[in-house]
């Protein structure tokens, strides 16, 4: 079957040749430049595709505004399938546009040869090209049968186990009023989403990390020394990364190696703590973390003058937060050693273990909580310094030139992170393999007396996940942006991985968190050693609850309320006639979008306008969250903004100057809302099934800002229109966003 065959064609652990399984194949093509009258199709050989007749080509479904997909199931040993992409006009009298080049070959779930771009020649000899992706996963016949059964069956209501805030509506057939059906496909209601955010699946996570400080305004480093030991192409291509200058224009300044390379002894403490679930009084599950030996020590009493000086020094390192986060930050600042005021999370792990994904997700979470957090990716430093053409030989431990170059950029990234912390930064995420004790000791020596280091090691023993990550890496990483042969890129990356495996040393020193087989979300282990303090505890709790299982999260405001019509703040009014119409359309949308999702749920606030909006949705459990209630307007509740301006001008001006921090008298600020939403975010991260969140403008602004990685200062200005659904698709490749406008 050739060397390019997918992992799914290999024998199972029991020695069978996949006789009990099938391959679920997904063909995807970017279509951001496809005109509205052209739709992507696939046609090809029998029996899998259908026909070489363009009129019988299979349409690709719109997975998002920028991606189309065709998926099908085949045996692992299926015959070679040859096919092509084509663009089909809606006008039948207009000829189809077939992609240029030879036929594509699919064998064992893998595309053979050069298959990363699809080229089309439009009118006027205009050439457009789109990236092409393929993914093949083995699925069992039982899974296929379950999916088909879920598709065919209507979800029947189950009994409620005495929980007052959970309900399931009756079957649609017995509903008193008919739903307002959507006349067309859901794609008809899709509207353009905002420009892709930093957290978008279209953006490689490492590219969003910090740029080197020594990168000048013109985009070049100082000095120049590029190792020539291991480039895949002998000629200097001068290719840029994200608009950055080519490697030949870059030079770099590295700290004196004599002050860096000397390693010191390992930390003596080896106590490993364990995590155990416990039951709180209100029945909610929590997590107990044994502090061990790392509890903060009390500092000596200070005079009044020295105390004032110290508070001035730490003012810039306090989080832009409220509630528990702010209180905990004060305690950590006052009680802990000076170096503990700054926290460095140092990633450890082999390539293709999800380090960068974890780093980006943790950065997003901490920023959303109000902590000044930055992501430093050593791979980005390396690419900016040495280019993107480094082969697997560059990463060999017996290649002294490669080792020196990689150590230099790691030291530079660490220096930049420490310098940023000394200017007031709070949490730095240091993203690299850091796979040897020598490298980790170097980092600890550089951080000594300046910041506290916690190692975060990701271990994965699931070959299927590793293989998937490798293929995603080749598709997304700038390291392989010039490698047109996909399978050649896979082979090179596997060689790189083998080089790291030969010298890998698990973390046993210092403070650390080990995540063992946690990425799949199906269990695994997490170990913590010498961990204490509020923020490290929150990080552990967040990591325990995150996973990579793809699932959609739908965010929508309630239907228009009577207070919306009157322009009044807050309140608990019913929905208007327009809101009732939206409630019916929303129910029809949910029925179409989540028809096969038996485990989906509907979350609302405790206010009646969200419950009335959800009332027409049937067949799914509904959960009320007080945390999803609208921002508390305090004494201004029920007033219009004009009344506030007239009767409380000082409050009106204070809110106008800083909507993020402004707190209504006896009410809440946006920062207060963020703090009460943290349990909601953790639960959304933990969920493996779709969730529909029906809430309010301020609350949805805060939730959306988390998923889109928007700065805190932008939250009060985020547009959150009525009668619009925002679909957030969470998965291994990042976050995809769609928007549906059901009515004006």
From Swiss-Prot:
InterPro entries: 6Pfruct_kin (IPR003094), 6Phosfructo_kin (IPR013079), Carb-bd-like_fold (IPR013784), CBM20 (IPR002044), His_Pase_superF_clade-1 (IPR013078), His_PPase_superfam (IPR029033), Ig-like_fold (IPR013783), P-loop_NTPase (IPR027417). Its EC number is 2.7.1.105, 3.1.3.46. The active site is at residues 431, 460, 558, 630. Residues 1-23, 213-245 are annotated as: Disordered. 6-phosphofructo-2-kinase activity is activated by pyruvate. 6-phosphofructo-2-kinase activity is inhibited by PPi, phosphoenolpyruvate and 2-phosphoglycerate. Fructose-2,6-bisphosphatase activity is inhibited by pyruvate, fructose 1,6-bisphosphate and 6-phosphogluconate. GO terms for molecular function: 6-phosphofructo-2-kinase activity; ATP binding; fructose-2,6-bisphosphate 2-phosphatase activity; starch binding. It is found in: Membrane; Cytoplasm. Residues 17-122 form the CBM20 domain. Residues 550-744 are annotated as: Fructose-2,6-bisphosphatase. Keywords: ATP-binding, Carbohydrate metabolism, Cytoplasm, Hydrolase, Kinase, Lipoprotein, Membrane, Multifunctional enzyme, Myristate, Nucleotide-binding, Phosphoprotein, Transferase. It comes from the Eukaryota. The keyword Amino-acid biosynthesis does not apply. Residues 213-232 have a biased composition (Polar residues). The keyword Translocase does not apply. ATP binds at residues 349-357, 469-474, 652-655, 697-701. Interacts with 14-3-3 proteins; these interactions may regulate both nitrate assimilation and sucrose/starch partitioning in leaves during the diurnal cycle. Synthesis and degradation of fructose 2,6-bisphosphate. Regulates carbon partitioning between sucrose versus starch during the diurnal cycle. In the C-terminal section; belongs to the phosphoglycerate mutase family. This is 6-phosphofructo-2-kinase/fructose-2,6-bisphosphatase. It comes from Arabidopsis thaliana. The gene is FKFBP.
């Amino acid at each position: 079957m050739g060397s390019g065959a997918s992992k799914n064609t290999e024998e199972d652990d029991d020695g069978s040749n996949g006789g009990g399984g099938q391959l679920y194949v997904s063909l995807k093509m970017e279509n951001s430049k496809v005109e509205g009258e052209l739709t992507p199709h696939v046609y090809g050989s029998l029996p899998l595709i259908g026909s070489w007749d363009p009129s019988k080509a299979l349409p690709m479904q719109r997975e998002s505004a920028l991606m189309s997909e065709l998926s099908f199931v085949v045996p692992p040993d299926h015959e070679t399938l040859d096919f092509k992409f084509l663009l089909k006009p809606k006008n039948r009298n207009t000829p189809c546009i077939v992609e240029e080049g030879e036929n594509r070959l699919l064998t064992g779930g893998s595309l053979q040869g050069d298959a990363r771009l699809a080229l089309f020649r439009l009118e006027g000899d205009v050439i457009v090209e789109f990236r092409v992706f393929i993914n093949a996963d083995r699925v069992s016949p039982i899974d296929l049968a379950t999916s088909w059964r879920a598709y065919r069956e209507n979800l029947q209501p189950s009994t409620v186990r005495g929980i007052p805030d959970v309900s399931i509506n009756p079957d649609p057939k017995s509903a008193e009023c008919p739903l307002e059906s959507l006349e067309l496909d859901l794609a008809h209601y899709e509207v353009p989403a905002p420009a892709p955010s930093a957290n978008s699946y279209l953006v490689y996570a490492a590219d969003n990390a910090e740029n080197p400080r020594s990168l000048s305004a013109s985009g070049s480093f100082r000095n120049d020394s590029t190792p020539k030991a291991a480039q895949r192409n002998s000629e200097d291509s001068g290719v840029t990364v994200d608009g950055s200058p080519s490697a030949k224009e870059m030079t770099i300044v590295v700290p004196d190696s004599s002050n860096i390379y000397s390693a010191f002894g390992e930390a003596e403490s080896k106590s490993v703590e364990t995590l155990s679930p416990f039951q709180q009084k209100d029945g909610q599950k929590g997590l107990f973390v044994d502090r061990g030996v790392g509890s903060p020590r009390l500092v000596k009493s200070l005079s009044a003058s020295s105390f004032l000086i110290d508070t001035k020094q730490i003012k810039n390192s306090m989080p832009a937060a409220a509630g528990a986060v702010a209180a905990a930050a004060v305690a950590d600042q006052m009680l802990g050693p000076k170096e503990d005021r700054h926290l460095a999370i140092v990633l450890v792990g082999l390539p293709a273990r999800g380090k960068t994904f974890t780093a980006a997700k943790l950065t997003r979470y901490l920023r959303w909580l109000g902590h000044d957090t930055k992501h430093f990716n050593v791979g980005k430093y390396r690419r900016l310094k040495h280019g993107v053409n480094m082969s697997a030989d560059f990463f060999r431990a017996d290649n002294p030139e490669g080792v020196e170059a990689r150590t230099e950029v790691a030291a530079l990234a660490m220096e930049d992170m420490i310098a940023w912390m000394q200017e007031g930064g709070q949490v730095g995420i240091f993203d690299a393999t850091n796979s040897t004790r020598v490298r980790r000791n170097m980092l600890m020596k550089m951080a000594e007396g300046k910041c506290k280091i916690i190692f975060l090691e990701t271990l994965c023993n699931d070959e299927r996940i590793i293989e998937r990550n490798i293929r995603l890496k080749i598709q997304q990483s700038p390291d392989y942006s010039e490698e047109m042969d996909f399978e050649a890129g896979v082979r090179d990356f596997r060689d790189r991985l083998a080089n790291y495996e030969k010298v890998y040393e698990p973390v046993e020193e210092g403070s650390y968190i080990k995540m063992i087989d946690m990425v799949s979300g199906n269990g695994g282990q997490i170990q913590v050693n010498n961990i204490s303090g509020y923020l490290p505890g929150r990080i552990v709790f967040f990591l325990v609850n995150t996973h990579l299982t793809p699932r959609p999260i739908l965010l929508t405001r309630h239907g228009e309320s009577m207070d919306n019509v009157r322009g009044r703040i807050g309140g608990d009014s019913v929905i208007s006639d327009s809101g009732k119409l939206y409630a019916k359309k929303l129910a029809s949308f949910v029925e179409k979008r989540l028809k096969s999702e038996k485990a989906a749920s509907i979350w609302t606030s405790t206010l009646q306008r969200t419950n009335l909006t959800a009332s027409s949705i049937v067949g799914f459990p509904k959960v009320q969250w007080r945390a999803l209630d609208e921002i508390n307007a305090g004494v201004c509740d029920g007033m219009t903004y004009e009344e506030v301006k007239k009767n409380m001008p000082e409050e009106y001006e204070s809110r106008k100057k800083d909507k993020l921090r402004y707190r209504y008298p006896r009410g809440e600020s946006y920062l207060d809302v963020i703090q009460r939403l943290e349990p909601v975010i953790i639960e959304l991260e933990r969920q493996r099934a779709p969730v529909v969140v029906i809430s309010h403008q301020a609350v949805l602004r805060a939730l959306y800002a988390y998923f889109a990685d928007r700065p805190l200062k932008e939250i009060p200005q985020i547009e959150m229109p009525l009668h619009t659904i925002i679909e957030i698709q969470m998965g291994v490749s990042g976050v995809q966003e769609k928007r549906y406008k059901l009515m004006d």
